[in-house]
Amino acid sequence: MNASLAEIEKQIEATKASIQFNFSQAVYGYMTEGMSEMEARAHVAFGNSDYSKAYREAQQEYLDLIDSKTEYVVNRTSAQIEELSNKLQLLEDSKPQEWIRISDIESYYASRSTLLQNQVSVYQKALEDVSDLTDEQIKDLVDGLNEATIALHEAKINALEDKTELQEKQYDAIVYRINLYKDELQDAIDAIE
């Protein structure tokens, strides 16, 4: 269905109004035939009056619209997650084999964390109203949320590890140069003596 979520929700509200109208008209019609209100209410679901038939049709339309809304939300969520996953993969593919600057590490992991946080937000938004979702759909959303949350925390840990590793390499390089200069200076002093 190409309708937007707002259009589907508008149709749902109109269908609810139709259900209520047809139900009340059917009850009224059955009561004018001599049924008690309780009998009339019970008879609406299987009666042959035009209002009973319209009521059942509106009920089915309502269920179909709820299915359309659920399908729309699931498809939209899937598309958003897929887009973010593709961006994460592109970012991962552009990651250098070896870091040169701390600012490169910070930039990479800031971008990665932003994309992962966006994934978490998409899952959280999808889980705000699960009343029309199946248990399997809810489980998939919760699993996705858990994976994205774990990946977000791992990105923060990896950023710290990569920064620490680069700083250690830079420190080792500085110590090596200092020792090299110290040896050269000692050789020069020995040559002067």
Question: Where are the regions that the model predicts?
Answer:
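Residue positions that define the register of long amphipathic alpha-helical repeats
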Residues: M1-E193
